[in-house]
Amino acid sequence: MLKRLKSFLFKMVLILLIAPIVLVGVVKYVDPPIWGWKLSRIVAPPKNYPDSSQHEWVSLTRISKNMQLAVIATEDQKFPHHYGVDFESLFDVISEAGDHGPSRGASTITQQAAKNVFLFPSHSYVRKAYELYFALLMELMWSKERILEVYLNVVEFGPGIYGAEAAAQNYFGVSAKQLSKWQAARLAVVLPNPYRIKVYPQSDYTARRTRWAMNQMSNLGSVQL
């Protein structure tokens, strides 16, 4: 009985380690038609979630450099240089965490992409550990350009509005390629919580954050991956 249990546990661990490698390998080349975050919204839609979502996948070359710089400036300024995990910020989060897991993310763009594509919303340590594993695999197997492309195509900018192209068209009536510095900053600042922080109507908080984002973009200067 014990031998069979050990064999079962070994196989489960093997599956949990190998399956992410396969998934990350596939998404390196294939744009996912559905992903974990979007699926969770469909299964358990939050308040004000629309009956149909908006999304159009575009390559990174069809997304404004302003938009690329805006998310790096606001979400993860170390993105061009780290290997998927900002361990300093991560240890800070763990030290502040309670009994039920971390209350805030401190996630890199790579971790956010991993969470959005491959996993489901949760604050548990198990999910966070799996997120780190996916993120490290993505950094190992993908280019920085692919990570940023996937992130900018799956992130939710508002209820049911996924990706930079859908957000640009919905909020500004332009393509993602045409986003100005101000428009890109305005979109980027809602990403911590697009259900609480909205592109429109503009609040005083959103206006302040947009100005802050534009200053950060100016300080960084350009996107160099």
UniProtKB/Swiss-Prot annotation:
Protein's cellular compartments: Cell inner membrane
GO molecular function: pentosyltransferase activity; peptidoglycan glycosyltransferase activity
Entry GO CC: peptidoglycan-based cell wall; plasma membrane
Membrane topology: Single-pass membrane protein
Keywords: Cell inner membrane, Cell membrane, Cell shape, Cell wall biogenesis/degradation, Glycosyltransferase, Membrane, Peptidoglycan synthesis, Transferase, Transmembrane, Transmembrane helix
Catalysed reactions, as listed in the record: [GlcNAc-(1->4)-Mur2Ac(oyl-L-Ala-gamma-D-Glu-L-Lys-D-Ala-D-Ala)](n)-di-trans,octa-cis-undecaprenyl diphosphate + beta-D-GlcNAc-(1->4)-Mur2Ac(oyl-L-Ala-gamma-D-Glu-L-Lys-D-Ala-D-Ala)-di-trans,octa-cis-undecaprenyl diphosphate = [GlcNAc-(1->4)-Mur2Ac(oyl-L-Ala-gamma-D-Glu-L-Lys-D-Ala-D-Ala)](n+1)-di-trans,octa-cis-undecaprenyl diphosphate + di-trans,octa-cis-undecaprenyl diphosphate + H(+)
Pathway connected to this protein: Cell wall biogenesis; peptidoglycan biosynthesis
Assigned EC number: 2.4.99.28
Keyword Magnesium: no
Top class in the EC scheme: transferase
Membrane-spanning segments: 7-27
Alphabetical list of Pfam families matching this protein: Transgly
GO biological process: cell wall organization; peptidoglycan biosynthetic process; regulation of cell shape
Protein family membership: Belongs to the glycosyltransferase 51 family.
PANTHER family assigned: BIOSYNTHETIC PEPTIDOGLYCAN TRANSGLYCOSYLASE (PTHR30400:SF0), MONOFUNCTIONAL BIOSYNTHETIC PEPTIDOGLYCAN TRANSGLYCOSYLASE (PTHR30400)
Role: Peptidoglycan polymerase that catalyzes glycan chain elongation from lipid-linked precursors.
Name under which the protein is recorded: Biosynthetic peptidoglycan transglycosylase
The organism of origin for this protein: Vibrio parahaemolyticus serotype O3:K6 (strain RIMD 2210633)
